[in-house]
Amino acid sequence: MPRLSDTIGRLVGQRMADAMTTTHGEDRLSDLTDFGANPGNLRARVYVPAQLQPRPALVVVLHGCTQTAAGYDSGAGWSQLADVAGFVLLFPEQRRANNPNLCFNWFAPEDMAGGHGEVASIRAMIAAMGAAHGVDPSRVFVTGLSAGGAMTAAMLANYPEVFAGGAIIGGLPYGTAHGVSQALERMRGRDLPDAAALTAAVRGASHHDGPWPTLSVWHGGTDATVHPANAEALLNQWRGLFGIGETPAEEALVGGNPHRVWRDRHGRVVIEDHRILAMGHGTPIATHGAEAAGQAGPFMLDVGLSSTRRIAAFWGIARVVGAAEGRAADAGGARDGGVAGIVNDALRAAGLLR
């Protein structure tokens, strides 16, 4: 009898993968074959640059449906950046035996609960990489696209003590779907839980009570695969964890697109949101200019902004690239003029802000 996640995966994965095809490119990754328990039956790929920083950071990268680890790396340019910044990369990879569309099973109860299935396999890989390369345990991060983004949310929820930060691209919040019908509805942006329930889902996933990982959210304003309402739900989920309100501390235009920042009560930046208004479903990349990294392809979308470089900069493990085109110095002040007004107008025009 096939696993429940197999059946669910065929349906949910097909929707997520309708237009997605594997991004091909040079395979710079190696296999990690002995990392301990693997209840999720995942493959582990890794990249270790020739020049490592002392006690390097570790970045875990989770591909989207129909993609491979090597294809995602080629498109997003993570190993390119690792060569410069000296951090280690771990790319868990789905197997077709688990999911015919190569989606991580973010919606299957047996794969999204701590200590079980795919999340447990990824956790074991992280431990093995940390031991093998002397990774700084305070600088472990995770990011992913689409189903990989939703699995990123699951990793952050189940193992918050492991991660300093996460970045979710075109993904969904944790704990909103348990089965095929719910997964499809959430992807359409329907019946998402309220902020309190979203936050409670993360708090209930572990015994952790803080500090919480920081979060970078990226979403296309015209994403027809995972509705942008999921980005707002993610923000609600994590603002609740940090105990901060809806109003951002700062707003800016980056590449003509809204960028919002939230700070905790100590003034530390803990959440950011990049909304690429004219972009559909995929990972934002730049193929030219100072922040060029990776290569364009299916669901590797050249919008002139490298999410890879900017996420790494947000985490503090790579050089900051570029600068905001304009910034509202005090987002708590006048909301209708200047950059803050432009950002809000842009979000409203895209139907992303009431």
What do these predicted ranges mean?
Residues 217-219, 223:
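Short beta-strand/loop motif that positions the catalytic acidic residue
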Residues 93-117, 179-180:
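Cap/lid segment of the alpha/beta-hydrolase catalytic domain
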Residues 225-230, 284-285:
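Conserved alpha/beta-hydrolase "acid-adjacent" motif
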Residues 1-58, 70-76, 84, 114, ...:
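A domain-start/cap signature at the N-terminus of enzymes
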Residues 149-161, 167:
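Short glycine-enriched nucleophile-adjacent loop
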Residues 52-100, 176:
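Short substrate-entry loop that stabilizes the transition state in hydrolases
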Residues 110-133, 154:
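Alpha/beta-hydrolase active-site loop
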Residues 142-144, 169, 218:
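Short beta-strand immediately N-terminal to the catalytic nucleophile in serine-hydrolase-like folds
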